[in-house]
Curated annotation (Swiss-Prot):
Record region (G2): 60-64
Lineage: Bacteria, Bacillati, Bacillota, Bacilli, Bacillales
Gene that specifies this protein: tuf
Keywords: Cytoplasm, Elongation factor, GTP-binding, Hydrolase, Magnesium, Metal-binding, Nucleotide-binding, Protein biosynthesis
Primary localisation category: cytoplasm
Family to which this protein belongs: Belongs to the TRAFAC class translation factor GTPase superfamily. Classic translation factor GTPase family. EF-Tu/EF-1A subfamily.
The protein's name: Elongation factor Tu
Length: 394
């Protein structure tokens, strides 16, 4: 079957659900697709379709990021259902990095929980521009005052991490009831999507900058070659253009021979699109997650840089003890983690949880970075800091 062309007439935005485990992120994702399907251009998606990665079934927690698409009158959305559980924050870091806006799901019955805070912090660190709040499971709360209290708590938490807590739209509803077809709660889903349409700014596309796409996944298509998938971070790529594969190994060049999005073929892709790029003459093992595809000469691989770093406090789930020069955590850039050695500036003996610090980092493998590149610092499966590159050294 020939693939149909992708419709570009509507503006496009990438959004996702974030929040504490079991507060209803996946149910809400299914409810949005199901309710919008009744009103027009969207294909309904069941909860099981979204929650379908094999690992998830055993533990009842969402691990992989599910991508679905739906439309409102105003926009076409690509929606990522971000994993909620702390063990899978690694995926959250790569998932949240793909968001022009987020829907923060908070169970009205439980209020904000540790991962609610962690996801707001991560959203701030990976540069998610705006969040909208969905207070879920309100059918389980009889007390109007309790709802108001939870809403106030969420707003305060957002303000604490520099989101405009007083202005953020908060919609109260029940994803499960909406999914079951309860008209009163379906209306709340439409209200939520109206808020997303209105409040989440039209993504400022970096289409005019040189092309770059962080590689998230790689697979081979028999008879066609190797495909790298990811979200175009900036610029445009047209079929037939040259790109460099940068990071981890020596830089190499290839030509993009095909571009597709949501299984539809494109002539070109631009910043914000989630695509698969078919690469000419590249073996499956020549490209890997953590590398980037970029316009030749536009970005270079480096191992040593200066950075401004915020070290999470113990209460935020960070370290309980200070660290010193020669500390060796993992540095997460875009889609991958690389071990690096920390060098603290003269006069800084140690760094306490909750501190801001300027540090020099030397990575064990080169990564495509430049001033302004953001990263997270992780150790033993948890985020302990976040930072931004301030100066490239080598």
């Amino acid at each position: 079957m020939a693939k149909e062309k992708f419709d570009r007439s509507k503006e496009h935005a990438n959004i996702g659900t974030i929040g504490h485990v079991d507060h209803g992120k996946t149910t809400l994702t299914a409810a949005i697709a199901t309710v919008l399907a009744k009103n027009g251009d969207t294909v309904a998606q069941s909860y099981d379709m979204i929650d379908n990665a094999p690992e998830e079934k055993e533990r009842g927690i969402t691990i992989n990021t599910a991508h679905i698409e739906y439309q409102t009158d105003k926009r076409h959305y690509a929606h990522v259902d971000c994993p909620g559980h702390a063990d899978y924050v690694k995926n959250m870091i790569t998932g949240a990095a793909q968001m022009d806006g987020g829907i923060l799901v908070v169970s009205a019955a439980d209020g904000p929980m540790p991962q609610t805070r962690e996801h707001i912090l991560l959203s701030r660190n990976v540069g998610v521009p705006a969040l909208v709040v969905f207070l879920n499971k309100v059918d389980m709360v009889d007390d109007e005052e309790l709802l108001e209290l939870v809403e106030m708590e969420v707003r305060d938490l957002l303000s604490e991490y520099d989101f405009p807590g007083d202005d953020v739209p908060v919609i109260a509803g029940s994803a499960l009831k909406a999914l079951e077809g309860d008209a009163q709660y379906e209306e709340k889903i439409l209200e939520l999507m109206q808020a997303v349409d209105d409040y989440i700014p039209t993504p400022e596309r970096d289409s005019d900058k040189p092309f770059m796409m962080p590689v998230e996944d790689v697979f081979s298509i028999t008879g066609r070659g190797t495909v790298a998938t990811g979200r175009v971070e900036r610029g445009q790529i047209k079929v037939g253009e040259e790109v460099e594969i940068i990071g981890i190994h020596d830089t190499s060049k290839t030509t993009v021979t095909g571009v597709e999005m949501f299984r539809k073929l494109l002539d070109y892709a631009e910043a914000g699109d989630n695509i698969g790029a078919l690469l000419r003459g590249v073996a499956r093992e020549d490209v890997q997650r953590g590398q980037v595809l970029a316009a030749p000469g536009s970005i270079t691989p480096h191992t040593k840089f200066k950075a401004d770093v915020y070290v999470l406090s113990k209460d935020e789930g960070g370290r309980h003890t200070p660290f010193f020069t020669n500390y060796r955590p993992q540095f997460y850039f875009r889609t991958t983690d690389v071990t690096g050695v920390v060098n603290l500036p003269e006069g800084t003996e140690m760094v306490m949880p909750g501190d801001n610090v300027e540090m020099t980092v030397e990575l064990i493998a080169p990564i495509a970075i430049e001033d302004g590149t953001r990263f997270s610092i992780r150790e033993g499966g948890r985020t302990v800091g976040s930072g931004v590159v301030t100066e490239i050294i080598e």
